[in-house]
Amino acid sequence: MSILYEERLDGALPEVDRTSVLMALREHVPGLEILHTDEEIIPYECDGLSAYRTRPLLVVLPKQMEQVTAILAVCHRLRVPVVTRGAGTGLSGGALPLEKGVLLVMARFKEILDINPIGRRARVQPGVRNLAISQAVAPHNLYYAPDPSSQIACSIGGNVAENAGGVHCLKYGLTVHNLLKIEVQMLDGEALTLGSDALDSPGFDLLALFTGSEGMLGVTTEVTVKLLPKAPVARVLLASFDSVEKAGLAVGDIIANGIIPGGLEMMDNLSIRAAEDFIHAGYPVDAEAILLCELDGVESDVQEDCERVNDILLKAGATDVRLAQDEAERVRFWAGRKNAFPAVGRISPDYYCMDGTIPRRALPGVLEGIARLSQQYDLRVANVFHAGDGNMHPLILFDANEPGEFARAEELGGKILELCVEVGGSISGEHGIGREKINQMCAQFNSDEITTFHAVKAAFDPDGLLNPGKNIPTLHRCAEFGAMHVHHGHLPFPELERF
């Protein structure tokens, strides 16, 4: 199969007529709410990455799963692209609508279908909020582990699409590690069950394949998640440092000593001051960096680990280490971290949130590199990230009202992601690729790998109608971007024009 000319997978879509699609949906999907006027669709023109905006052809809001099947059948027959949207909190433009496509909003599917405390699992619809799962199972002393900062709003369907993580993913894993099975609706009408209620299933791991596929392979209609028992005890240490490099080295020292914290987060001075002004978490505003280290388990183990981590932090150069004295202070420490993004939004007209992953050993050097790039592009960068697993979230501060600043912020963001790749990391940790990072995929993967990605997509979506132009670039795009891998002086596909 040739992928070179599958341009529809990169945004070159067939012409469609709004009226004909609207009439077909009204005819074949009774009772469906359809938004089609400019006033109605404006609220859906972006996801959490509000710098990118496109108004869709139509917005559909089904309330029954049979309607989802019928919507996909109509779009399949008319060859109309479909972008699926959950809560719209994504930060990479993954749910950015297409001007020639239908936006399928799954937000009304908010029912928790079943809770099995003995089997430690819950079966939920895709529009259920992440935090709502933990709230629903709390009476059973259980919770759902992945906890992205947007957990009060983000949906579990969106979490599956992006393979979301959170501040506790170092110990408890990403979304993919906390799923048992999902129900998926394909564009051609086929329904699949991926995974099972058992902890392992024979055959290819299609559940893992779909998790993080950003709505490019199918539409998630039901999710069965694993539940964990709440730890009897959780303690948080807050360590202050006079340099981000020392804080970065301390992260590696903790892990090297065989300690796996429930959460291990870092913030630099700019983000510390912003969060403290916003939340009053008790952060030291004179520190160049802080580490938040949460240890959980049984009382005796936690007490021992707290003493060990305290010593490790001081030996690594911490100027001060504080142990949260009670649950209220522990919650306050975490509130500052979880509200760091909106806190930074209060000190800058706009900010651009990046998401890259690096090996822990590379943390000090990458932080130095980001500081150099910040000076080069004359844009401030606040660093907030999951230090334990090297998942960085540099926040690039800019003013969109200043001509050229957003373009400069985009370019700086791209350079930071390429720096992550250079040191053996990845251009995404949990936010996905979407439209935002599609060019950097050309730096992360070679042409053979990208061709394989397209082959996988074509196996599930041969017409390329599910969320086209996202996640996977065409080879043409990589040629234009100029980032295709050159091996022994040989440039793949030399017949493609370079720009």
Per-region residue spans from a language model:
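Alpha-helix capping/hinge segments and adjacent helical runs
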Residues: G31, V421-I433, A458, P462-G469
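C-terminal substrate-recognition/cap domain of FAD-linked oxidoreductases
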Residues: L35-E45, V225-P229, R235-L412, L419, ...
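A glycine- and small-aliphatic-rich helix-loop capping segment at beta-alpha/alpha-beta transitions
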Residues: S92-K110, A138-L142, G165-V176, V223-P229, ...
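FAD-binding subdomain of flavoenzyme oxidoreductases
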Residues: E111-E265, G482-H488, P492-F499
